Amino acid sequence: MSKKIVIIPGDGIGQEITDSAVAVLKKVSDKYNLNLEFESHPAGGTAYDLCGTPLPQTTLEAAQNADAVLFGAVGGPKWDNVEPTLRPEKAVLGLRKGLGLYANLRPIKVADALVEYSPLKEEIVKGTDVLIVRELIGGIYFGDKCESEIYEGNERAWDLENYSVPEVNRIVEFAMQAAKKRKNKVTSVDKSNVLATSRLWRRTTAKVAEKYPEITLENLYVDNCAMQLAINPSQFDVIVTGNLFGDILSDEAAVLSGSIGMLPSASIGKSTSLYEPIHGSAPDIAGKGIANPLATILSAAMLLRYSLDEQEAATCIEQAVDKALAQGYRTPDLYKEGFIKADTKTMTEAVLKHI
């Protein structure tokens, strides 16, 4: 039985980088007899130009009926003056809501060949392989809020943070299951010395952990975790945390690799999940054929790992990327004298030959 993968290239370099990832998926599909089918749909500014909306209903329905979605990037200065409700970025929010995406996964792995690109010293960053699991649809971002009110004669604004036990259960269960396939360690991050929601988070996490005696659970305050990511990132395996803390920590950790062009991500849904690079649409280099496709190729590996449970095929892609880098291939965002300068096509071919 075939598996349907919906491709949403989006804007800017989105088409180029998703084309690269699809080429890799097709080759790995042939190698492992995965029987993948691909279907492309518009979103973002491109969709707005075509249909007058950043997320056509046909695109959303196709995504909802797919086994997985591979997403490029959206946005660009061309649409800066579009009505706010029709901005390209609204496509991402619509997909999150329409697919019920509740967990964001951000793997931070520093390839041996790229250690020198990290802002941290080699002895600190080498061996870093962290998976940050961020709760995506709860917490302060989605709580009640007030932009402005007068209280005791002064203007104030407020945002309400809340989490329920089922929301915490779901995200912590996911983190525990992910850790079972890695190094059996979960670090739960909160601010339970100050916040009531964090105290509920910590109590609930402890109860979930009782079902996983093989998993080592540690709890860290978010400020300590932020510091530890900078001074000893290799100590972590899986980090699980709420929406706000996860947003901040995942962006901090992204710096460790030295280039956002290397970092994939996944947003996990109840039935369909979405995979995308963390970088933007880079309209300044769109159409030039020089974009780094590796984050999108690694997002495709995550798709195989988490949506299709094709662990061997996912590892094959990840190892092919490592081998291409070890051979010295570098796109312009990573190029230094002494390496092989590669455009998008050349880098993709360098990965393909190792599959």
What does each model-found stretch correspond to?
Residues 137-138, 143-182, 186, 192-194, ...:
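Glycine-rich phosphate/pyrophosphate-binding loop and the adjoining helix
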Residues 45-48, 229-329:
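Glycine-rich phosphate/nucleotide-binding loop
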Residues 113-115, 220-227:
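Short acidic loop-to-helix transition motifs that present clustered carboxylates
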Residues 49-158, 244:
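N-terminal glycine-rich phosphate/adenylate-binding segment common to multiple enzyme folds
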Residues 33-57, 227-229:
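N-terminal beta-loop-helix "entrance" segment that forms/cooperates
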